[in-house]
Amino acid sequence: MRSPNQGMEGLTITPDDSTLVGIMQSALKTPGLEGSAKPVPLARIVTVSLATKAVKEYLYPLANPAETKVAVSEITALSNTLFLVDERDGELQPRGNKKVYIADIADATDVGPGANVPGGVYRADAGGLQLDGKPVETLVGVSSDVAAVDKLRSLASPSHPSR
């Protein structure tokens, strides 16, 4: 469920030619999310095994898009799990906001169709991985990247009521 003109923005193949990797330009528009998905600080990195066609999804925290207006422009594979990600806004320099980040999914949690997240259920028809009965993007809503990551970490905490 992508927002109009906010789809898969970059594609790359890992150096060993085993995996196609893409990244969504911004957050997915999930059920229950009020307004635009653009200011939600979670995009997705999607991997597809070229041998088995297995799909995995990983959350990528955008740098405060509600404030910075950034979205993802490109992704480049440095290894099977390490990527350069270009975030940018639509402004020209010197006011523009353009940065390149390193994203490492080596120890990241798959939130895609094969997700095995404690307390989570994957429902493609309802926006993907559900935590506390809501899709991830709807759950974190419009917030900072730090607040979104903190919220997701608190859900994974052994003291959370769903554990």
What is the predicted function of each stretch?
Residues 1-163:
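Sequence/structural signature of beta-propeller domains
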